[in-house]
Amino acid sequence: MKFIIKLFPEITIKSQSVRLRFIKILTGNIRNVLKHYDETLAVVRHWDNIEVRAKDENQRLVIRDALTRIPGIHHILEVEDVPFTDMHDIFEKALAQYREQLEGKTFCVRVKRRGKHEFSSIEVERYVGGGLNQHIESARVKLTNPDVTVHLEVEDDRLLLIKGRYEGIGGFPIGTQEDVLSLISGGFDSGVSSYMLMRRGCRVHYCFFNLGGAAHEIGVRQVAHYLWNRFGSSHRVRFVAINFEPVVGEILEKVDDGQMGVVLKRMMVRAASKVAERYGVQALVTGEALGQVSSQTLTNLRLIDNVSDTLILRPLISYDKEHIINLARQIGTEDFARTMPEYCGVISKSPTVKAIKAKIEAEEENFDFSILDKVVEEANNVDIREIAQQTQQEVVEVETVSGFGPNDVILDIRSVDEQDDKPLKVEGVDVVSLPFYKLSTKFGDLDQSKTWLLWCERGVMSRLQALYLREQGFANVKVYRP
């Protein structure tokens, strides 16, 4: 079998040296992706296309599918490469190939020709089209919007019978641009923004700020692995996970409510910039869109950017949510994003949309930056190829209950402000308050003869914190969902 890879048009308008470099990189990327399917596969580059030849017919569909997901490819032609002698020979081969496909249909013939011949492309189109029209009684020529377009390519003494055309994702080959670090949360925005930078030729590494324990990290790892495996597997990339719970805890205790969102984002940018510098990455990528949430106003984004010299790319800055969700659906991350948890208690209730630099800096003076340095130093860095095996390990399950027994105590894990605004009172059972960001250090001080029913407004943080405590060896925890 043979495939002809057509280049993304922006590649073809580059200077000769740049075009050759892009084609060389794309050829290498194709080899890296396809070698897992057929070790005998051959990839040959030319000035205006790349040929892929393989012997194992059983791998035809998977090879074709893989090619449609490699950045830099405009479209793929599946072809049968045969020799020919003259125009009549071209017609006979076209008739044998397309007879069944053209019965009862309207059609036209389109020919591309390279090399020296005694005929022109238009002459071949007329001769083959007329012959097909005469020999297939139910077929009819229609030059505009036909049911079937018969594509033929003539190159020297070879005829390429095009059996199918399949669209690629376009863009630039990965590796033609410099590396970036995507701040991935597993939601709609970060997945789409990561894809967009891969499509633009960047090798995308991933940085995840863990706010909710092992279950959340496993979910985000699966999203990152999916994106890499589907669109970027030609290159090795890193997945860096930073336990940000201590940072969130410090913010909730030391920072004014209205400034929390901006301060949290500034801390994330500081941490990600340190990771980027460590690995020689040139830019950060976020999924922020202008005005989508309070921290994404121009004033706040400017303040967030000011904490680092590292370039921050925001490919979705002008996109609306519907457009982003549609893109997530197209690339296959929508289902991941819809099931990814949101966190109660992490963002302030009355966030500022126009933060003042002096006030933000004054709030940050109360922050213990040694905590930020420590979580970055302890960040977990893994090769993304290992994630498939690691995420297969089962997360400890935790029981969810709607009632309570005589030995049960409800543990309200919301932030202090949320508890003050809406105190939890449940008749017939004791309620104890312990904010989620203190669970890792303070839960062991509680009466371990009791069964603790963790509760929060949405039930997401309580489940994740219960999972975390179970992993730490505490078997006396459940989730309370009345």
Curated annotation (Swiss-Prot):
CDD domains associated with the record: PPase_ThiI, RHOD, THUMP_ThiI
TM stretches of this protein: none
Disulfide bonds: C344-C456
Keyword ATP-binding: yes
Reaction(s) catalysed by this chain's protein: [ThiI sulfur-carrier protein]-S-sulfanyl-L-cysteine + a uridine in tRNA + 2 reduced [2Fe-2S]-[ferredoxin] + ATP + H(+) = [ThiI sulfur-carrier protein]-L-cysteine + a 4-thiouridine in tRNA + 2 oxidized [2Fe-2S]-[ferredoxin] + AMP + diphosphate; [ThiS sulfur-carrier protein]-C-terminal Gly-Gly-AMP + S-sulfanyl-L-cysteinyl-[cysteine desulfurase] + AH2 = [ThiS sulfur-carrier protein]-C-terminal-Gly-aminoethanethioate + L-cysteinyl-[cysteine desulfurase] + A + AMP + 2 H(+)
Matches recorded under SUPFAM superfamilies: Adenine nucleotide alpha hydrolases-like, Rhodanese/Cell cycle control phosphatase, THUMP domain-like
Molecular functions per Gene Ontology: ATP binding; CCA tRNA nucleotidyltransferase activity; tRNA binding; tRNA-uracil-4 sulfurtransferase activity
Catalytic residues (positions): C456
Pathway participation: Cofactor biosynthesis; thiamine diphosphate biosynthesis
PROSITE patterns xref list: RHODANESE_3, THUMP
UniProt key word Heme: no
Compartments, as annotated in UniProt: Cytoplasm
Entry EC no(s): 2.8.1.4
Broad enzyme group: transferase
Main location: cytoplasm
Boundaries of every THUMP domain copy: 61-165
Alphabetical keyword list: ATP-binding, Cytoplasm, Disulfide bond, Nucleotide-binding, Redox-active center, RNA-binding, Thiamine biosynthesis, Transferase, tRNA-binding
Domain Rhodanese, residue spans: 404-482
SMART domains named in the record: THUMP
Residues where ATP binds: L183, I184, K265, G287, Q296
Pfam families for this protein: ThiI (PF02568), ThiI_fer (PF22025), THUMP (PF02926)
Family per similarity comment: Belongs to the ThiI family.
Database matches in NCBIfam families: ThiI_C_thiazole, tRNA uracil 4-sulfurtransferase ThiI
Described function: Catalyzes the ATP-dependent transfer of a sulfur to tRNA to produce 4-thiouridine in position 8 of tRNAs, which functions as a near-UV photosensor. Also catalyzes the transfer of sulfur to the sulfur carrier protein ThiS, forming ThiS-thiocarboxylate. This is a step in the synthesis of thiazole, in the thiamine biosynthesis pathway. The sulfur is donated as persulfide by IscS.
Protein name: tRNA sulfurtransferase
Source organism of this protein record: Salmonella typhimurium (strain LT2 / SGSC1412 / ATCC 700720)
Source organism phylogeny: Bacteria, Pseudomonadati, Pseudomonadota, Gammaproteobacteria, Enterobacterales
